[in-house]
């Protein structure tokens, strides 16, 4: 399993300014996938970018070179490798499989058990498949991750905290308003999945909704009956009367700056505080908005904290969390067993084919000139002897594959089946830290 590597940049431990630069919007995924697949040795690649993380999963045809992968990612995002090395988490084999399964099940999210991530994983593999960057191995890995999420949520029920980043944002807004959200004016900016989730949570909380989008028709499509629909040009005026605004777009641009909130804002609002929540990466709201009197700004970093009124930190029931982790472990083993069978199948087939060819040659040679009644006895003796000699290498090859000993698998396949040199199904690989690079500034090893 050393052919699978993951470079992870988790939002909980990486500065927002760096995460913004690493964030890959849906429209940018094809270019990112192409750039990363162009790294020598990369056969398949998956790029997962959400408001909480950016991760790259690579399946290699030859010896893995995570340092090259990191340099390619940095270059594609217009960064040097040095800032990324400080925050990169490198995972290989079982750890990489386990990580994707935990992420997809919502167990690595700051809202434990959230299910929005499943759709994001599916979108990531769909984008990679469109670029021809998904083969059987990565597809099976994603299938395992989605199945794990399904099992976790079905098996744990209400024991695993149900919610999302959107519902957490709405709860935070309700906690900051004197009388909650019921009957208050909430402005939602965006028309994508995040905005849809915010609208649903706010509607349940009883808010009066206004949906604002670059495309008013798309805004109207997600707005519930009775909600106002506006274009982005109407945003400044809408802020004058809103009690709160939640940004949930995929735009890489700053849509709200301190200068957009003129000096008359506080006077017009008669001293009412405007709550602004930015769920976007890159951020839609410039951090300088924090300095505007009468405005309270929350971004994802704030929502991860426990000090925000209304923010209820995810606290799954211990039994549910334990069950979820058990399910992840089971599905990791299931995927690895599939991989072992696949990795060992071709070398074993070649070995057995060579054994059969050897038996046929030796039988033909040994029985030449023998009487017909002796031929079967000699042939059977030769067959048993050769198969007995081949049993040990075959068993060792299967055991090595099961233990993830790729070097041993490749060695045995080469020794006992010479044609294995032409097949790269299970190449030898010695893991190297990301920092092993000729770039002196990029010589550090990523955190584990």
UniProtKB/Swiss-Prot annotation:
Its EC number is 1.2.1.70. The keyword Kinase does not apply. One of its GO terms (biological process) is protoporphyrinogen IX biosynthetic process from glutamate. NADP(+) binds at residues 190-195. GO terms for molecular function: glutamyl-tRNA reductase activity; NADP binding. Residues 423-448 are annotated as: Disordered. Substrate binds at residues 50-53, 109, 114-116, 120. Keywords: NADP, Oxidoreductase, Porphyrin biosynthesis. PANTHER family: GLUTAMYL-TRNA REDUCTASE. Possesses an unusual extended V-shaped dimeric structure with each monomer consisting of three distinct domains arranged along a curved 'spinal' alpha-helix. The N-terminal catalytic domain specifically recognizes the glutamate moiety of the substrate. The second domain is the NADPH-binding domain, and the third C-terminal domain is responsible for dimerization. Belongs to the glutamyl-tRNA reductase family. Homodimer. Catalyzes the NADPH-dependent reduction of glutamyl-tRNA(Glu) to glutamate 1-semialdehyde (GSA). NCBIfam families: hemA. During catalysis, the active site Cys acts as a nucleophile attacking the alpha-carbonyl group of tRNA-bound glutamate with the formation of a thioester intermediate between enzyme and glutamate, and the concomitant release of tRNA(Glu). The thioester intermediate is finally reduced by direct hydride transfer from NADPH, to form the product GSA. This is Glutamyl-tRNA reductase 2. It comes from Nocardioides sp. (strain ATCC BAA-499 / JS614).
